UniProtKB/Swiss-Prot annotation:
<feature type="region of interest" description="Disordered">
    <location>
        <begin position="872"/>
        <end position="892"/>
    </location>
</feature>
<feature type="compositionally biased region" description="Polar residues">
    <location>
        <begin position="947"/>
        <end position="956"/>
    </location>
</feature>
<feature type="compositionally biased region" description="Polar residues">
    <location>
        <begin position="1259"/>
        <end position="1272"/>
    </location>
</feature>
<dbReference type="GO" id="GO:0005694">
    <property type="term" value="C:chromosome"/>
</dbReference>
<feature type="region of interest" description="Disordered">
    <location>
        <begin position="1216"/>
        <end position="1272"/>
    </location>
</feature>
<feature type="compositionally biased region" description="Low complexity">
    <location>
        <begin position="411"/>
        <end position="458"/>
    </location>
</feature>
<protein>
    <recommendedName>
        <fullName>Glutamine and serine-rich protein 1</fullName>
    </recommendedName>
</protein>
<feature type="region of interest" description="Disordered">
    <location>
        <begin position="1149"/>
        <end position="1182"/>
    </location>
</feature>
<feature type="region of interest" description="Disordered">
    <location>
        <begin position="1390"/>
        <end position="1476"/>
    </location>
</feature>
<feature type="compositionally biased region" description="Polar residues">
    <location>
        <begin position="289"/>
        <end position="309"/>
    </location>
</feature>
<feature type="compositionally biased region" description="Basic and acidic residues">
    <location>
        <begin position="1435"/>
        <end position="1451"/>
    </location>
</feature>
<dbReference type="Pfam" id="PF13926">
    <property type="entry name" value="DUF4211"/>
</dbReference>
<feature type="compositionally biased region" description="Basic and acidic residues">
    <location>
        <begin position="1222"/>
        <end position="1233"/>
    </location>
</feature>
<feature type="region of interest" description="Disordered">
    <location>
        <begin position="923"/>
        <end position="961"/>
    </location>
</feature>
<feature type="region of interest" description="Disordered">
    <location>
        <begin position="265"/>
        <end position="322"/>
    </location>
</feature>
<feature type="compositionally biased region" description="Polar residues">
    <location>
        <begin position="1397"/>
        <end position="1411"/>
    </location>
</feature>
<comment type="function">
    <text>Plays an essential role in the protection and maintenance of transcriptional and developmental programs. Protects many bivalent promoters and poised enhancers from hypermethylation, showing a marked preference for these regulatory elements over other types of promoters or enhancers. Mechanistically, cooperates with tet1 and binds to DNA in a common complex to inhibit the binding of dnmt3a/3b and therefore de novo methylation.</text>
</comment>
Length: 1673
């Protein structure tokens, strides 16, 4: 059921795509009713049968990401929602209470499904979509119902779908029925069946095929519901009608009615009946499905007939049936694929039907019966293609094909249409969508409709031109591709065309795909199905592809593009689970299948999983696209050629591809269509020609990749980990399809089976091989070889097309992908990390998973693997590489093994083409990771795929089975890995690395390392920043980046080297950083090394666990840490943690301090730490402490830990230091340790701290040892309370006087202290008052001066004890080595007034915080000044020791210049560094001081003689505040003066005139002239009263522009007191107006009670000082 649900979710997403289409069709009605994007998509497919409009709409949806970059909302929301949808329903469909359902009218649901489809379409059709979407949400079949709607319109297509469903249902009838029941309930909620029925009836009337399909669909899952909701879905013309529930029997109006039907589908009212009927259908559907799985596909006409009845009933049922069908398909990822295959079978024209299927498939996972109908619909859609609905969804193409294109376009036109639409679609998913969006019957003329897909409008212009013959293009490529674009499956279609039209459609497809992919990951399943569809639609071309695998012979026939052949091929394709499709678009398809599978599972398991898959896929697509984007358009042609070559690699496909480079022959069946369309379109539309060509190129390269991407998206989301791994090669997916057909029961294992099926589907690519290989794994492997070829093609196509597309449409699309994928990625990463952590719990499991992962990575290629992981996090960047999706799986876990295989195979070709681009882009890395040599890669990949066949199984099992299975799979994986490493070393290398990393502690880390290389290669920078995985394996990341970069180049240069690197990476995985470094450098190190490494790691881990039992539980702790730190650390958290714990003894500290920079070193360090677990106790202790400090960051310590975790580290270190300081001995030993660590870890930032600590900590010990011999400089006088004659005079000397720090000395020791300081001998200790405690400060010698260092000894200070001590005045010298150093003042410092108030704060903060700040301060003074500056602001009442030290240093330099009076105040309050100032300003003491300053000025406004009176009385309350503030201002002013060399006249003017203005005039000369104008009344500086008027009221001075700001600051500082005085005057006057009877004191208090006003002044004061500090720094 998980798988079904995944498919359903995919379908829902695809449907949402359709929704977007509909709005463009029928903006008014659809928008409101089609909030469920999915439904809309389906509906569109059905409703827009004749016109390519709907497919175009889908295209818009897909395209819109590019076209409507601004529509990212759809994409992003859709991603999020999509995930939600998947998660909620587990189906990927929305559960009845799913937000999407609830959001019927909201755009979010649409966005959800649309996320994959395209934000533009989504946004357009959100309203419409909501209903449809709601239906989807309520039940998987809902999406299907939408599809049903389409199917209804395409009744003819329905039957084939049903047979397909049947086959699917055979395997999972029970689950399907369950799903159908659910769907039924959902349908009830949404009553879409009625609409579907009406559409069905209409379609039936107009096109028996479509009606049949509809009947078939509704029959399968929504017989009754269909009647209820028939009107809803069916009446294209009667959109309004939909509510009727009465089937609109305007089948003849299929085109129009479909359109209406779509709207009706959207309305939730109609949908509910559909749901109800759905229930009935589910039971029927399974039988039907089982009855005519492939047969019906083949017998599209028969199916049509047989389903005709159903169709009528099942108008609404269609939706549910679609779901049922999907459900049937669901049994395997292929199930999604299957409907597409069915569509393919139904008719190459029926790609749209296929699309429908795709959605159905998606839904099928959830509701087999419903999905079946959808599938059926898909098939019929082909027939109905001409029928309005064919275009609808699955039959966007189908529709075009059937109705519009079917006859004229059927062969050529259809091809063109497909190419066109595909192109238009791929060029800008939106483009295809544009037509669809038109969705008006207009779409019927595919060309226009494509254009109409406004979302793709902008895109459309480019692609639409291609679509200039949209109706035709839509029909041909449309089937798979256009439909994809037109319906929710637009994405899928796009994807499908991509595979089908590897060469010709690929560009469009991929273009579309990328855009759709991001927006409609849900479409991914669609895509997958769509892919099949497209394959089917391009059934000729795709069937050819199939024929490459199983239908290679047929493929050539398909090339003829005969409808029957196409249908037969489609059916065959369906039977083969789109093996042909998988062959050419296997990657796409497999991705799609993967998606369905993954979707289902992920939907069930976690939204994150789903979104992650989606994100990964998106990211991968984005990456690939990016890569492809990187490649110039010129490259696109190369890719196209390459694609053709790739197609030839596919085998028979090659001939066709070569024959029709435009069409891309078999492999590019759709591609050929695309090419034809392109050619035709070019002929038809010269203006479009360039874009079309580009699109064509894109489509060639895009189609496979596009399909892959879409499939990957869906696949990645749901199946990414398990299914993708299993279908590591695209082959797995075809295999799945085949398996689906062959063994529907496999659905029993929703996930494992899916994986197996997917593998079979991939095998289906090498259909014969897959079928021959009974086992999923074997199938996957076999298909792996072929799929690899196809994948290579795909990757090449994708690469080219991705790059072009990325540039053309994916620019906007990428952002969508990025946002979605990023969102999904984070969630998924989180989940996957959790899985990794759990897996890591057992070292063996870890090692196994590592092996598995390594295998997957190997298969995938370093590039793929890295990219996929990165894709997850950085979808946009990684999106380009299709293989990455599979890589993502590998990254997720053992799953990746299969993916790698596929990716490797597929990517190798791309590598050669992409390699060029890879270096420029992310793909660069992925490509590099794959195999640089296309030919060699192909062979290698084929071999690898075969070798991987078993590993994929293992991967699948681990995926499905969980950790246990992972272990088993890992075991197999290890053996397989060797083969992979040998044959496909490049891909294996990554996995190997992963394995080692897992062994080293972590699948997570291995994932990270894999990701990192990809990230480094693909978007090294972005990956690091955006990809949690990358950042997680910070060490690896750093190295991987470099390694990846090198690797990319190396890959391009040496395929073998890359392969070696992969194994190396595995071995390197030991050290998170090492893997990356070794990655590129150690090519020769083989899989064995990594395996041995894993073994060593296991042993070490075991040893560590024995020695440190906490290590076992450490994973839990690390997991918690991971939860705290976030997904970025997830991957590395488990992996790093174990090593981290093991390493802690060694040099873990190094890592946190220098995550990024030390990545290589830290990698080396990590292994060292692992090996060093048995290092000396001292070292272990030291490392332990360091580790504790690093703990917070050790998840992402490699890269992001430094910045993010510095605070945590410091706080931890502070806590440690506080504990350590309990004994002086500890401090000393700590100092020694610090010295050692400093020596050991010189490169780490921490080493700086250690160094500082070491010397400082050693110094304390030195003084004691050397005290007898050494004498400190003598100090004649000591400032002791009651003993000093000079009061309020500058004490002089170094250090900062802090009034709140109260130190005392025993009365009996005073004389001793004086004598000792005078002679330089060791004096008695002094004590710091800490509330009721006294902290002992022992004498030490620092720089020849006598100082006192803090200890952890305390005495009570209360009661009589207070009478035994006298206060001694000290200055804070520094805080080093976690110790506070002070010196006794020779004279009493001036500002003692505030001591009482501050002492309290100081005691608390001094005691508790001093220890904290000192540790951070261990860093070099400069660093400290920087960091403390930031921190100080947070600490309110504590003027941290760091700050004090800085003040000391900075003031010591300027003390001689400043007056003694100002110095002491300024030292504390006006530290030169602005950060210090701000920090200081944030302290309570500073606020109190400033408040006293304001109080004095307020009183001054009321009494002009107040200042003189205070001075006479020597006031110790307000004057000290005044002096402090003025001291700060004067010190800053002096600092400014040193920088601002003013002429005396200007200086005098600035100091005399209180008003200041800058007059700047622009002149023709190079520099603008600047004048300073000063004016205002002079005033007395003491009383602030106006003085005699100046001779001139104002003066102007010309100054350099850069000096004007300095003059402004100087003026503000000089007149600050006066300006505040004026503000106080204003405040007092305002208070007096309100309260005239207040006395002077009351007035002052009233003003000060205005806290906001006072704080505002305080903030501005701090800002002023900060500006000065920044200017002077």
């Amino acid at each position: 059921m998980n798988f079904l649900s995944a498919i359903e979710s995919r379908t829902a997403q695809a449907a949402s795509s359709g929704t977007t289409l509909l709005p463009q069709f029928r903006a008014p009605s659809w928008q409101t009713g089609m909030h469920s994007s999915t439904a809309t998509e389906l509906f569109v497919t059905g409703a827009l049968q004749t016109s390519g409009t709907f497919p175009t709409s889908a295209l818009t949806a897909y395209q819109h990401p590019n076209t409507f970059s601004s529509r990212n909302f759809a994409t992003t929301p859709s991603l999020a929602l999509q995930d939600g949808t998947f998660s909620a329903a587990t189906n990927g469909l929305l559960s009845p209470h799913d937000p999407l359902l609830q959001i019927k009218t909201s755009q979010t649901p649409t966005a959800l499904t649309f996320e994959r489809i395209g934000s533009a379409v989504l946004s357009t059709s959100i309203p419409q979509s909501s209903t449809y979407r709601s239906a989807q949400e309520s039940a998987p079949h809902l999406l299907q119902p939408q599809f049903s709607l389409l199917p209804s319109a395409l009744g003819g297509t329905q039957q084939p779908a049903q047979p397909y469903s049947t086959s699917v249902f055979t395997g999972s009838t029970a689950s399907i029925e369950r799903a159908l029941q659910r769907e039924c309930s959902v349908i009830k909620h949404h009553q879409r069946p009625s609409s579907t029925q009406s559409v069905q009836a209409q379609l039936s009337g107009t096109q028996h095929s479509l009606p049949n399909y509809l009947t078939s669909v509704s029959g399968v899952s929504l017989h009754d519901a269909s009647r209820q909701s028939s009107l809803l879905c069916a009446p294209l013309g009667a959109l309004t009608h939909v509510s009727n529930g009465g089937p609109v029997q305007k089948t003849s109006q299929v085109s129009v009615e479909l359109s209406q039907s779509y709207p009706s589908v959207i309305p939730s009212p109609g949908y509910p009946p559909s749901s109800t009927k759905s229930k009935n259908c589910p039971t029927k559907a399974p039988p039907r499905s089982s009855k005519t799985p492939k047969s019906q596909s083949v017998v599209s006409p028969e199916l049509t007939q047989s389903y005709t009845k159903s169709s009528q009933n099942q108008s609404s049922v269609n939706s549910s049936q679609a779901q049922a069908f999907s459900t049937a398909q669901l049994p395997s990822l292929l199930s999604v694929s299957q409907p597409p295959i069915y569509v393919s079978t139904q008719s190459p024209n029926l790609p749209s039907a296929s699309q429908s299927q795709v959605f159905s498939t998606i839904k099928t996972e959830k509701l087999p019966p419903l999905y079946k109908p959808l599938t059926v619909f898909s098939s019929q859609s082909q027939t109905i293609t001409s029928g309005s609905q064919t275009l609808s969804y699955s039959s966007d193409q189908s529709l075009s094909l059937s109705s519009v294109s079917s006859e004229t376009y059927s062969d050529q036109t259809r091809d063109l249409s497909s190419a066109n639409q595909s192109q238009s679609y791929s060029s800008n998913n939106s483009q295809g969508l544009t037509s669809v969006s038109q969705s008006q019957v207009s779409y019927s003329s595919q060309s226009q409709v494509m254009s109409p897909v406004s979302p793709s409008d902008s895109y459309t212009s480019g692609q639409n031109q291609t679509l200039a013959s949209p109706s035709l293009p839509f029909s041909t490529s449309s089937r798979g591709q256009n439909l994809s674009s037109s319906s929710p499956t637009q994405n899928f279609i796009s994807m499908h065309p991509t595979p089908n039209t590897q060469d010709s459609t690929s560009p469009q497809s991929q273009k579309f795909l990328p855009s759709v992919q991001p927006s409609s990951f849900a479409s991914s399943p669609h895509s997958q199905t769509m892919q099949n569809s497209r394959t089917t639609a391009d059934s000729k071309s795709y069937v050819k592809r199939k024929s490459d695998t199983n239908l290679y012979a047929s493929a050539k026939q398909e090339e003829k593009f005969q409808m029957q052949d196409l249908q037969a091929l489609q059916q065959t394709a369906l039977e083969t689970a789109t093996p042909g499709l998988s062959e050419g678009e296997l990657n796409t398809q497999e991705t799609a299948y993967s998606v369905s599978k993954a979707d289902d599972r992920y939907s069930h398991s976690v939204i994150k999983s789903n979104s992650r898959m989606e994100e990964q896929v998106l990211g991968l697509q984005g990456t690939k696209k990016d890569e492809r984007l990187i490649s110039p358009v010129g490259h696109m042609p190369q890719h196209v050629g390459h694609l053709n070559n790739s197609a030839s690699h596919d085998g028979k496909k090659n001939t066709d591809l070569i024959q029709s480079t435009q069409v891309s022959a078999k492999d590019l069946s759709q591609h050929t269509m695309l090419h034809k369309v392109l050619d035709t379109k070019m002929q038809e539309q010269p203006s479009t020609s360039p874009q079309l060509q580009a699109a064509m190129r894109h489509s060639q390269h895009l189609q496979l990749p596009g399909a892959q991407v879409l499939l990957d998206s869906g696949c990645d989301l749901q199946m990414f980990q398990q299914s993708m791994l299993q279908s590591n090669m695209g082959q797995t997916k075809p295999s799945a399809q085949m398996q689906r057909i062959q063994s529907p029961p496999q659905v029993a294992h929703p996930f494992l089976q899916m994986d197996g099926q997917i593998i079979q589907s991939n095998g289906a690519q090498s259909q014969q091989s897959l079928h021959a290989q009974g086992s999923d794994v074997i199938k996957m492997d076999t298909s792996n070889g072929k799929h690899l070829q196809q994948h290579l093609h795909t990757k090449d196509h994708f690469s080219h097309r991705g790059r072009l597309d990325s540039k053309n449409q994916f620019d906007s699309l990428n952002p969508m992908c990025f946002s979605e994928s990023m969102l999904l990625t984070d969630e998924r990463n989180f989940l996957s990390h959790v899985d990794d952590i759990l897996a890591a719990t057992a070292a063996q499991e870890f090692a196994k998973s590592s092996n598995e992962e390594n295998l997957s990575v190997k298969n995938q290629d370093a590039k793929s693997r890295f990219q996929s992981l990165n894709v997850r996090h950085m979808s946009p960047n990684f999106t380009p590489p299709k293989p990455q999706n599979m890589n993502n799986l590998s990254i997720n876990g053992s799953q990746s093994a299969v993916n790698l295989s596929t990716v490797s195979t597929t990517q190798p070709k791309n590598v050669s083409l992409d390699q060029t681009h890879i270096q420029p882009m992310e793909q660069d890395l992925p490509s590099g990771m794959v195999s640089p040599v296309p030919g060699a890669n192909q062979d290698d990949h084929e071999k690898n795929s075969e070798n991987i066949k078993n590993p994929p199984n293992v991967n699948q099992e681990p995926k499905e089975g969980g950790n246990i299975q992972e272990e088993v799979g890992d075991a197999e994986f290890l053996s397989n890995n060797k083969t992979l490493s040998e044959e496909n070393t490049t891909t294996e290398g990554d996995f190997i690395m992963g394995g080692d990393e897992n062994a080293a502690l972590g699948q997570v880390q291995s994932h990270l390392s894999k990701i990192d290389p990809q990230a480094g290669g693909s978007s090294t920078i972005e990956m690091e920043e955006d990809c949690p995985d990358i950042s997680q394996d910070g060490q690896q990341k750093g190295k991987d980046k470099m390694a990846i970069k090198q690797f990319t180049e190396d890959e391009n240069a040496n395929l073998k080297q890359i392969k070696r690197n992969m194994p190396l990476k595995r071995s390197v995985s030991k050290g998170p950083d090492v893997p990356g470094a070794q990655y590129s450098s150690h090519v020769s190190e083989g899989y064995y090394d990594s395996y041995q490494h894993q073994e060593r790691m296991r042993q070490k881990i075991k040893e560590v666990e024995e020695k440190q039992p906490e290590v076992k539980t450490g994973f839990i702790a690390s997991f918690l840490d991971f939860l705290k730190t976030g997904p970025k650390q997830q991957f590395s958290a488990p992996a790093v943690r174990v090593p981290s714990r093991v390493r802690r003894p060694c040099t873990p500290v190094i890592r946190p301090p220098c995550p990024g920079p030390l990545s290589p070193q830290s990698v080396a360090g990590a292994p060292v730490s692992d090996s060093g677990s048995a290092s000396p106790p001292k070292k272990a202790e030291e490392d332990l402490k360091k580790n504790l400090e690093t703990l917070p960051s050790f998840s992402s310590d490699e890269d992001d830990a430094t910045v993010g975790n510095n605070d945590l580290q410091k706080s931890i270190s502070t806590a440690l230091s506080a504990l350590d300081e309990n004994s002086e001995k500890r401090l000393k030993t700590e100092g020694d340790k610090a010295a050692l660590s400093a020596k050991q870890d010189p490169s780490t930032p921490r080493n700086g701290q250690d160094k500082t600590k070491a010397p400082e900590s050693l110094k304390p010990s030195q003084p004691e040892a050397t005290q007898p011999e050494q004498l400190a400089k003598s100090q004649e006088t000591i400032a002791i309370e009651g003993f000093t004659d000079e009061e309020n005079t500058e004490s002089g000397g170094e250090g900062i006087y802090r009034e709140r720090d109260e130190f005392v000395v025993k009365i009996e020791d005073i004389e001793l202290l004086k004598e000792a300081l005078c002679t330089g001998k060791e004096p008695p200790a002094i004590w710091k008052v800490q509330k009721a405690l006294l902290q002992k400060f022992i004498p030490e010698i620092k720089d020849g001066q006598r100082s006192f260092a803090a200890t952890n000894s305390y005495l009570g200070y209360f009661g009589d004890a207070k009478t035994k001590y006298k206060r001694v005045y000290v200055k804070f010298v520094e805080n080093a080595n976690k110790k506070e150093y002070v010196r006794v003042c020779s004279r009493k410092p001036k500002s003692k007034v505030l001591q009482p108030a501050r002492t309290t704060h100081t005691k608390a903060s001094g005691g508790s915080k001093v220890s904290e700040t000192p540790p951070p301060k261990t860093a070099p003074p400069k660093v400290v000044s920087a960091k403390p500056k930031a921190k100080p602001q947070k600490t309110k009442a504590e003027p941290p020791p760091k700050k004090r030290k800085q003040w000391k240093e900075e003031f010591s330099s300027s003390q001689s210049d400043s007056s003694p009076d100002m110095q002491s105040d300024e030292e504390e309050f006006a530290p030169p560094p602005p950060p210090i100032v701000t920090r200081f300003l944030n302290t309570r003491a500073m606020k109190e001081t400033f408040k006293g300053y304001v109080e004095l000025l307020v009183g001054l406004t009321l009494d002009g003689d107040m200042m003189q009176n205070l001075e006479k009385e020597n006031d110790d309350v307000l004057l000290p505040h005044m002096r402090k503030i003025e001291g700060m201002l004067n010190e800053n002013r002096r600092r400014l003066l040193t920088k601002l060399q003013l002429e005396q006249p200007l200086k005098n003017a600035l100091e005399n005139y209180p008003d200041f203005a800058i007059i700047s005039r622009e002149t023709k000369s190079k520099s603008a002239a600047c004048k300073i104008k000063v004016n205002g009344k002079w005033y007395n500086k003491k009383t602030l009263r106006p003085a005699k008027n100046p001779s001139k009221q104002s003066q102007e001075f010309p100054v350099e522009p850069e000096k004007s700001q300095l003059c402004s600051l100087y003026h503000a500082l000089h007149h600050y007191k006066y300006h505040i005085y004026l503000k106080c005057k204003e405040e007092v006057s305002s208070v007096q107006k309100a309260n005239r009877d207040l006395k002077q004191e009351e007035l002052v208090n009233h003003c000060l009670k205005n806290i906001k006003w006072v704080e505002d002044l305080f903030e501005k004061f701090g800002e002023l000082l900060s500006r000065v500090q920044q200017t002077c720094s």
